[in-house]
A protein has these predicted regions:
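Nucleotide-sugar donor-binding catalytic core of glycosyltransferases
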Residues: 1-214, 225-243, 260-281
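Short alpha-helix at the nucleotide-sugar/activated-sugar donor binding site of glycosyltransferases
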Residues: 220
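Conserved acidic donor-binding segment of nucleotide-sugar-dependent glycosyltransferases
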Residues: 244-250
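A cross-kingdom feature marking charged/low-complexity
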Residues: 250-261
Length: 281
């Protein structure tokens, strides 16, 4: 089974212009996957200006017309940034990107998905293990997130829902600057975290560093319906049939009748195996 993540999307592209030299630091590369016969070009958004320069001097040879795919970034793409990218590359036919906040006829949103497999919280074997367990849904709403990921947005969420749905994990999260502390924390907690999601009908998923959040897709893979606030990308995902509840403000959560019947109505016959690149093209 393929999990949606930045690495998965990159490997759909014949020309891949970004890699990682270690767990944290990305690097511009010029890699042509000869096994893929397509005009898809993958680039981390932060390197698009550099790519334009390299293309002009001939260091990178882009197709005359191509489809761009950007991922592995927290940049939210609004109208101004979209125009900037098309000014750099007027020969783009289609562009697929995460964190898309503006409607454009040539640009389509793709999910952040789960963490990349180079990260401990993107360990796909761990996901498959929990997905293979039979989890009876015994919890209505699961609330567990690191407020420090996006303090303003996440405190807003917490302040508006905590009377009814308090934060379940009040343990201190590790120092984000330490990869080892992060990995130790994930290795000791993620299985139970995923099990709690799987046992819950609904999972609260406030925005992350970018508007999309790994938790949204962790919930979907655990067959829990994510509750998110509205932005362009999630509206499009919902239109594709991906089960989620979209609200405009977290104060609305208290008015939702979050029942097993609502879960069944929204989830319907959705199959997580349909989550692949073709769904978003």
């Amino acid at each position: 089974m393929n999990f949606l993540c930045g690495t998965y999307f990159k490997h759909q592209c014949g020309l891949q212009l970004t890699d990682y030299k270690n767990a944290r630091d990305s690097v511009f590369v010029n890699f042509k996957d000869e096994s893929l016969d397509n005009n898809l070009v993958f680039c981390k958004p932060e390197y698009l200006s550099l790519l334009s320069t390299y293309a002009k001097i001939g260091s990178v040879r882009l197709p005359d017309e191509f489809d761009l795919l950007t991922h592995n970034s927290d940049i939210n793409f609004d109208a101004q940034q979209i125009d900037y990218v098309f000014d750099l590359f007027p020969n783009i036919n289609n562009w697929y990107t995460q964190n898309l906040v503006f409607e454009h006829p040539k640009v389509k949103p793709i999910p952040i998905g789960i963490a990349n497999p180079k990260w401990s919280h993107g360990n796909q074997s761990r996901f498959l293990e929990i997905m293979g367990e039979s989890q009876e849904k015994t919890n209505k709403v699961y609330v567990n997130f690191n407020v420090s990921t996006n303090p303003s947005a996440r405190y807003d969420c917490l302040n508006k829902i905590s009377d009814q749905y308090p934060l379940e994990n009040k343990n201190n999260y590790p120092n984000a600057a330490s990869i080892q502390d992060h990995d130790n924390f994930v290795d000791s907690t993620q299985k139970d975290y995923l099990r709690y999601i799987a046992k819950s009908y609904f999972t609260v998923s406030p925005v992350g560093n970018g508007l999309d959040c790994h938790k949204t897709w962790e919930a979907i893979y655990m067959k829990s319906i994510p509750i998110v606030t509205r932005w362009h990308g999630v509206e499009k995902f919902q239109d594709m049939g991906i089960p989620m509840i979209i609200i405009d403000d977290w104060s609305e959560l208290k008015d939702l009748d979050l029942t097993a019947n609502l879960y069944k109505k929204i989830w319907g016959d959705f199959d997580i195996k349909t989550l692949n690149f073709n769904l978003f093209t």
